[in-house]
Amino acid sequence: HLEQVFTDHGVTYTRTGVTEKNLKPDFILPGIVHYHDATFPQARLTMLASKSTCKDRWRQILNEAERIPNKHLLTLEPSISENQTCEMQAERVQLVLPRRLHSTYTPEQQTWLMDVAAFIDLVRQRQLA
């Protein structure tokens, strides 16, 4: 599904490209070749992990792409606890959710959540820079 969304919006990406320690993040945008190119600006790189549910598994993404300090995590899990989302923020993990799930989070959490459209806009801006 995500790959189709990326294609529909003209977003380039690599699925499960290999990074440090032979790790394979779900998506590197614009691509793994750019990730490994030391001259490519770090600010234009994006990593997106995709997990249908998070629980404590979200921490697995923290070391998947060392060049990208701010990670994005797409999930379909409603109402993750405030403790968990505070930990995510502290670890620089931005939660991305379909807009319809935002209402399952507290008003304070909702101010920080990103929807899929905003993620696509961010990535497109980075790819056009």
Question: Where is each model-derived feature located?
Answer:
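Catalytic core segments in nucleotide and nucleic-acid processing enzymes
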Residues: 7-129
